[in-house]
C-alpha cells in the first residue's frame, strides 16, 4: 500500500504551492489532481497580481514559492498599478499566456524533488481518533498518510449556472466532488455556499480595435521573482472598451433570466468583483462600465473581456456583447457562467491552517472562503510548510499582520470568518506602508531560511542583495553637495550652508531616483535601480515608518501574550455575559487576537490580562 507523509488534494494555485513547500522541506509528498496537465490552471482571468494581490505574490516568492517565478516565464503584459499614488498601494500585475503558465508549472512540478503527482479523484478521507489516516480514491484504493491538505477550489459540490441551465462541475468540463463535501459534513464542519463567475470568451480576430482604447504595458517589465533577472517573454497590448445604455437596457430586461436574480443561486458572490448584472443593479446611475480586453496568449486569439462576468442565458450574452463598442461583430467562443461551491467556515482552522477538529487536516484556498489565485497560493504555501513541519515534529510557521499580507489574510479569516468571497486589499492591512511589494523578501526570506523552506540558490541571491543594500546605502550617505550648489541646480532646499547627502535629498518633495542619478552619475554603476527605489522609499517615508514600527512593536507584544486553551471566560466576573460567550466561541489564542474580535471592549481586554496574571502567574498555560 502506498504511503506518503503529506498528501495534497487538488492541483490549483493553493495545491501546487502546498505540495512544493512540503517537498522543499524534505517531506515525501503526493499531489493528487484530476488532470496533471492542468496544474496551476487559470480558471478565470489569465493574470497574476494586482493591488494587494501583487504583494501576496511577492511574499510567496520570498518563501521560495512558485507563482512569481512561473508568471515571469509566461507574463505577456506587465503593469504596475497605482504607480502615481504612494508605494504602500502599488500593485504589480502581469497578464499571462495561459498555455505558457501551465506548461512552466507542469515542468517545474514534475521534476520537483520529494514530490510525486497522481492522476485521480479522492472520494473520502479515513480518520481514526480524530487523526488523519489515509485518503480513499474513487477506484477504492487507499493511500496512507500523516497529513492531508485540502485545496479543492470550486469543486466541492460545484454547480455551474448559465441562465436557467445547471451543470454539475468544478469548472468547465471537469466533474465536481461530492464525496469530500459529504466527508466534511460527516466530520461536523460547517459548510456553506459561495458563488463566483467568469465572463464569456470572445474571438480577438473579430474585434474592431479602432473603437477601443489602447492599454500598453510597462516599457520595461518588472519581474515578480527575485530569481528572475529579465522577463524574456514577448509583450503585447491590452485594450479598453465600455458598456453602453443599450447594454444596460438588455441586462435590465433579462434580469429575471439571470441565475443570480432568479433565485436559482443560493451562494453569495464576491462583493468587489461583481457580475455585470450586479453592476447594473447596484450602480444604476452609472451610464457605462469599463471592460478590459485581455489576450489569453501570444498564439491564442481568445480574449478575456474583464468586467462582464455573467450568468445570463447564452442568447442574452450574445445580444449584450454586440452593443459594446468594438464588439458589434464579435464571435463568442464560450459563454460566461456563475459557479456555486461549498466552503468551510474558516474559523474552523487555526493560523497554521490546520483544522481544529481533525489533527493533520489542513485547508487552503477557496475552501476557506477566499477568492483569487494569489489568496489561494498564499494559503497553500503556509499549509504546505506547516504540514511538513508537523511531520518533522518542528514548531509551526506562523505569519502575522505585522509582517505580511498573508498574515493579515489568515488572521482575518480565522478571527472573523467570512460570509462572502474574501479578497485581499491594501486597506485590510494597518501596516501597509511597512508591508510593501518591494520589501517582501527583506521581511520574509530570512524567516523561510530559518525553517529550511528556501533553496540554496535563493539564499545566495538574498544574501547578495542584502550586501548590496548596505553598500548602496553607504554610498548614498557619502555622496553629498552643499545647499548652494543644489540651489543652482534648481533644487529647493534651506540655504543653511550644510551638505546634503542623497538620502537627505530623497526626503525633499518631488525629488526622485532619476534626479539623484542625474546629479550623481556614479549611481548608474550600482546596476540595481530596485535597491535605489527601495532606499528612496525608506528615506522618504522614514518618519511614518518609525511611527508604524512602534505600532508594530505594540502589536507584537500583545501577540506574545498567549491565552491558555483551558481558560474559562465565565469565571472572569468583570466582563459581560455577551463578551464571555463571544470569547468562548472564538477561543482567541492571544490577547492581540482577542482585541480584534468585534464587540470585545478595551475594558474586557484589561480584565482578561489581569485575570491571566492572577490565575496563571505560575506560568501554567495549557
Curated annotation (Swiss-Prot):
Protein name: tRNA uridine 5-carboxymethylaminomethyl modification enzyme MnmG
Subunit structure: Homodimer. Heterotetramer of two MnmE and two MnmG subunits.
NCBIfam families: mnmG_gidA
Record's function text: NAD-binding protein involved in the addition of a carboxymethylaminomethyl (cmnm) group at the wobble position (U34) of certain tRNAs, forming tRNA-cmnm(5)s(2)U34.
Localization of this protein: Cytoplasm
Binding site for FAD: 10-15, 122, 177, 366
Family under the similarity heading: Belongs to the MnmG family.
The keyword Cytoplasm is assigned to this record: yes
UniProt-listed SMART domains: GIDA_assoc_3 (SM01228)
Named cofactor requirement(s): FAD
The UniProt record lists the keyword DNA-binding: no
Main localization of the protein described in the UniProt heading: cytoplasm
A Gene Ontology cellular-component term: cytosol
Keyword tags: Cytoplasm, FAD, Flavoprotein, NAD, tRNA processing
Organism domain of life: Bacteria
A single GO BP: tRNA methylation
MF (Gene Ontology): flavin adenine dinucleotide binding
Residues annotated as binding NAD(+): 269-283
